[in-house]
């Protein structure tokens, strides 16, 4: 009997070995399945909770309250409740009925890449947004969703997306480099004709994409932005914005919201020009985005990126349209709201530096008005601005004065004239001939005897031009001083008045000099000992008292 059960000692050893191998194989297979198990993010979901964008409320135990508080501190919204709202909840159609009558030509003509950059995003909230994109977007349009995990990725989330959502391309940053850098990384991988940037806590609504694409198909230098509604941080209720608004900014770069101009209001629901992107959700032609250089690589973490891209788009030949027939709901997180706060009120030093970069590159001489309201930012150090300035010159972008006067006249009427200094206006007289004045005759600058009227008055303009009527003093490539018709573009040879030496300086360190022999003007290397380079500007004392005599010294072209 014993031999039948175990056989020889050799047979017994073989039996034990086979048993161990099978056991180990089963154990490894089981543990591997455990480690790669797909988390069911619908485990806690309650059917119809939050359906149609309605408020969601649940009774909570003490344990639930503690858990909810911890998650709220981490994610800045009610993540506990989000776990109980279905990932594929439906929302109402919030569009104007007129939108339903519009036929769009975008389907089957372009492809779209959605770019989402996240930092420690709550998985359920992110997935709900991704599912809304997939269910509310035509498969003919949606080429891919590029999801960039900016440091500390959630492995369960990554695994779920990998197995359940093959349309999503996931990129993992080894360390957090900020949302701006993550967005640039995602855009670099995207291959669709049009890029649509979203954030990780939003939901799109029915018919949201074609209205954003249509204006871009008509003009690929158009950037479009939907009407951004709010999703409650506490109840996840979808709250429709009652009336479209115009986003603007003041001299502190704080957001202000203005009513639409009458023409835009009467044309609703047609798209209308917007002076600035809110920046959380927008669409842009991929080639045009990279033609503009994307975002300034010197912008770190977050903040200032929406303003930078807005000014870049407008000043470099594009336009921004708000699209009422496209609606997207956003959860407004506290840190994102802080990132868009005026830099003088912003607690983040990096955000302050970001805004300073934008100001120094794009606001031209008007940056001095910004510094009057934000003096502590004047002396902040920032990385080299050579690249964004070179890009601006290469693209032949327009001046901020053009933006102020042409893009946002309504905004100008509200605030862009507020706080502006009156620039010096007066006669310009050479020290060597104090009874003579600088003037223009026959299109040429001349020195002639002064009149008692204002006929010889000159203005040192906000664009650092010496202006007389509609003519400006300019310098040609041979350093000859001439008079040309003033333009709204930035001068290649800006002028400033050196109060200490009473000289007008342009074209580097060259000074306006009277040629006594020819009774004309030349441009020579500045020399404080040369009396012919000294000029009396009759209103310069008032200018000095306003602490802005160096206005053109600090302008960087």
UniProtKB/Swiss-Prot annotation:
Residues 271-333 are annotated as: Catalytic subdomain B. The lineage of its organism: Eukaryota, Metazoa, Ecdysozoa, Arthropoda, Hexapoda. Probable inactive glycosyltransferase. This is Putative inactive polypeptide N-acetylgalactosaminyltransferase 11. It is a single-pass type II membrane protein. One of its GO terms (molecular function) is carbohydrate binding. Keywords: Disulfide bond, Glycoprotein, Golgi apparatus, Lectin, Membrane, Signal-anchor, Transmembrane, Transmembrane helix. Belongs to the glycosyltransferase 2 family. GalNAc-T subfamily. There are two conserved domains in the glycosyltransferase region: the N-terminal domain (domain A, also called GT1 motif), which is probably involved in manganese coordination and substrate binding and the C-terminal domain (domain B, also called Gal/GalNAc-T motif), which is probably involved in catalytic reaction and UDP-Gal binding. It comes from the Eukaryota. PANTHER family: N-ACETYLGALACTOSAMINYLTRANSFERASE, N-ACETYLGALACTOSAMINYLTRANSFERASE 4-RELATED.
């Amino acid at each position: 009997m014993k031999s039948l059960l175990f056989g020889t000692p050799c047979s017994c050893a073989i039996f034990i070995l086979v048993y161990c191998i099978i056991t180990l194989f089963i154990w490894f297979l089981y543990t591997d399945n455990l480690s790669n198990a797909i988390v069911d993010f619908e485990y806690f979901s309650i059917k119809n909770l939050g359906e149609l964008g309605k408020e969601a409320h649940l009774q909570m135990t003490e344990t639930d309250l503690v858990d909810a508080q911890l998650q709220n501190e981490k994610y800045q919204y009610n993540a506990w409740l989000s776990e109980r709202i279905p990932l594929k909840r439906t929302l109402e159609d919030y569009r104007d009925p007129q939108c339903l009558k519009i036929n769009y030509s975008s389907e089957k003509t372009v492809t779209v890449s959605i770019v989402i950059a996240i930092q420690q995003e709550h998985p359920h909230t992110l997935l709900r947004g991704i599912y809304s994109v997939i269910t509310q977007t035509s498969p003919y349009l949606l080429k891919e969703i590029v999801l960039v995990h900016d440091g500390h990725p959630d492995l369960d989330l990554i695994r779920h997306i990998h197995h359940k959502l093959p349309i999503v391309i996931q990129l993992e940053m080894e360390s957090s480099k900020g949302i701006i850098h993550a967005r640039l990384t995602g855009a670099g991988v995207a291959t669709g004709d049009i890029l649509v940037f979203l954030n990780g806590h939003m939901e799109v609504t029915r018919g949201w994409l074609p209205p954003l694409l249509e204006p871009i198909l008509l003009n690929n230098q158009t950037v479009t932005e939907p009407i951004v509604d709010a999703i409650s941080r506490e109840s996840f209720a979808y709250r429709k914005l009652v009336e479209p608004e115009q986003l603007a900014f003041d001299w502190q770069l704080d957001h202000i919201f203005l009513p639409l101009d009458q023409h835009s209001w009467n044309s609703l629901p047609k798209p209308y020009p917007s002076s600035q992107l809110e920046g959380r959700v927008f669409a842009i032609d991929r080639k045009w985005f990279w033609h503009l250089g994307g975002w300034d690589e010197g912008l770190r973490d977050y903040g200032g990126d929406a303003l930078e891209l807005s000014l870049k788009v407008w000043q470099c030949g594009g336009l921004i349209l708000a699209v009422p027939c496209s609606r997207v709901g956003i959860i407004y997180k506290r840190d994102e709201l802080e990132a868009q706060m005026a830099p003088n009120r912003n607690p983040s030093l990096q955000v302050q530096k970001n805004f300073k970069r934008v100001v120094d590159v794009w606001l031209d001489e008007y940056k001095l008005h910004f510094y009057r309201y934000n003096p502590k930012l004047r002396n902040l150090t920032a990385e080299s601005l050579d690249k964004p300035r070179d890009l601006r010159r290469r693209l032949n972008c327009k001046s901020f004065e053009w933006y102020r006067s042409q893009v946002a006249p309504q905004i100008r009427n509200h605030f862009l004239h507020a706080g502006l200094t009156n620039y010096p206006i007066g006669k310009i007289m050479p020290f060597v001939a104090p009874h003579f004045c600088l003037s223009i005759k026959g299109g040429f600058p001349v020195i002639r005897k002064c009149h008692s009227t204002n006929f010889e008055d000159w203005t040192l303009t906000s664009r650092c031009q010496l202006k007389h009527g509609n003519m400006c003093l300019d310098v040609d490539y041979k350093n000859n001083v001439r008079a040309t018709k003033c333009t709204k573009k930035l001068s290649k040879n800006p002028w400033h008045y050196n109060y200490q030496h009473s000289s007008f300086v342009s074209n580097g360190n060259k000074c306006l000099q009277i040629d006594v022999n020819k009774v004309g003007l030349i441009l020579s290397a500045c020399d404080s000992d040369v009396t012919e380079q000294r000029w009396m500007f009759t209103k310069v004392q008032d200018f000095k008292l306003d602490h802005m005599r160096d206005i053109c010294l600090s302008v960087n072209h």
